[in-house]
Amino acid sequence: MSPLECSECFGDQLLHRTYTWQLTLHSRPNYTRKRDTRSESLEIPISVVLPQRGTAEPFPRLHNLYSTPRCAQQAALPRLSRRMASQHSYPLNRFSSVPLDPMERPMSQADLELDYNPPRVQLSDEMFVFQDGRWVNENCRLQSPYFSPSASFHHKLHHKRLAKECMLQEENKSLREENKALREENRMLSKENKILQVFWEEHKASLGREESRAPSPLLHKDSASLEVVKKDHVALQVPRGKEDSTLQLLREENRALQQLLEQKQAYWAQAEDTAAPAEESKPAPSPHEEPCSPGLLQDQGSGLSSRFEEPKGPPARQEDSKELRALRKMVSNMSGPSGEEEAKVGPGLPDGCQPLQLLREMRQALQALLKENRLLQEENRTLQVLRAEHRGFQEENKALWENNKLKLQQKLVIDTVTEVTARMEMLIEELYAFMPARSQDPKKPSRV
């Protein structure tokens, strides 16, 4: 080994020296292959640049043995053959395996910033790497404490990390897509839930309306008296300490009564609107209907119209006046004493007896109205049944009248035919009387 000086490799810095060692490797012939008894020898040049004492750079650096030579001395160095070329195109690894001074302790990679690509040899389909002064199989080699991981190892680690990151990104992307799909499905389900809730509320409201619909002519006619009761209840709804709970109950009852009144008014207005065109579309009774069934249709028509029209006649008016008087008396009993007692007692009542009494009376009145509502509903159903029967009777009477008319026409035709035949017989007899008697027994002609 002969050291060579190189002053042009690092930019005319004369304080650097370059040392080159020539390693020669002899291998035995491979007798396993037939006709292959050649021996192989490899020459490996190693060039190291070391600074002298007192230089500015504290660390030695290596030449890149496979780059373009920068000086004549470097160009004169022997090159590696093709079989000794590096198997990687990555930058040179850092090398600190061979100690420069055998008496000194080998320096670590942090102390020596040496770029070095370990030589590799491929023999019989196996790759060998020069490590720690000996050739080691690449698959079975161990990492030396003075050897840093190779570039391929770093590259593999980097690729493994990239692959893991790519896998994680793909998993995150798939999870985000699944989350997005689940959110869309959740939105659709929430919309369907809202639509179903709206339908359910509408269904409940329609059921409540059907149940609360009830004809109440008394409330329809005497709405003024109920308005007075409402005003009295509103006056009673002033907060008074102990009476707050009772007043709240009164408010709820008042709201229920208002809703019931509005529903009944709407129902009766609709019933009157439907009854008016039905009465207008009724066919006028023909004059021939009266002899067939004079009393049946008239009685049923009067009975039906009396329920849906305004009461006519003195008995109906007397009954309505009696009911109105009873209702007004009940309302006066509910509202009158409360006003007098409030005037006597004053704003602060010791206990809530008066509102409770008024609430009981209102409940009784509401129960009576509900009973009357049920009775009127039953009467309305019976009236509908009677109306259907009335229509059936009308059709039967019409058929009977047409049958009687046809019978009368048939009778008239028969009478006219008999009269014509009788006159023809009389004329034939007169003709035979004027004709001369040809024979004693003349034959009479047949009837025409």
From Swiss-Prot:
Residues 164-198, 242-267, 356-414 form a coiled coil. Pfam families: Chibby. Residues 270-323 are annotated as: Disordered. One of its GO terms (cellular component) is cytoplasmic vesicle. It comes from the Eukaryota. One of its GO terms (molecular function) is identical protein binding. Residues 279-291, 307-323 have a biased composition (Basic and acidic residues). Keywords: Coiled coil, Phosphoprotein. Testis-specific. The modification Phosphoserine is found at S41, S86, S89, S97, S124, S144, S148, S150, S212, S225, S335, S338. Homodimer. Binds to NEK1. Belongs to the chibby family. SPERT subfamily. This is Protein chibby homolog 2. It comes from Homo sapiens. The lineage of its organism: Eukaryota, Metazoa, Chordata, Craniata, Vertebrata.
